[in-house]
Amino acid sequence: VGWKEDFNMAVRCPVPSQESAYRYADSILDRTERFLSAKKSPDIMIGGHSKGGNMAVYAAMQITQSDIEATNERAQRLGLLPALGGSVPGRNCRISRIFSHDGPGMSQVMVHSRAYQAIAARIDKTVPESSIIGMLLQSQIKPTFVKADAISILQHMGSSWQVTQSGEFEQASELTGGAQLIGKTIDGWFDRVSQEQRERAINQIYDIFAAAGYGNIADLVAHWTDSLPKIVAAARGTDVQTRELIK
């Protein structure tokens, strides 16, 4: 858990926290059944920041996948062909919105799955204008860009996001040039290397960030003047490919 799992999310799915998020969201749907109105159960909204945003999307996907499997089983019993696309009837329909605030995406396999496509229109993805974390992996969701008063990776801290007098996020038009370059570099690296190379590099990057002595990215960013020199020193001991990625 912690740093190790954060980095494992880049090469594995699911990780334990994603499964925990699914069980929790599923239990909320169960518990709110008792608040039945005259005709329907109440809708819910789920979401989170950073890894929490990814976990919220995963939880909604798994609830939807359970509905897909139940629908296919009913179709099979009735001798009907299973539906291949479109909305999925079931408990997932009670999830009205899924918020991912600077949360990383999913693998290509996941975002092309029927479960993901069924919930995609309900995902509200918000990232700061210099986002790095939130632009990792795939999402197929056009995010809302938010102005922030920090620089680069420090914008991951939600406290730097600007809010208008009416209480809405102050929107930016697009990612900064620097964030776009970093995103293209990381995506290009993932496309070039094998799964084995990715896992080895992820393990090395984990060791580098762990050397800073902080348990999560929020603490590392908050104490960047202390953590950055330690990260640079630890990076010198990695292989060339990993050093190039960090640069």
Predicted regions and their residues:
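Gly/Ala-rich beta-loop-alpha elbow adjacent to hydrolase catalytic centers
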Residues: 48-52, 56
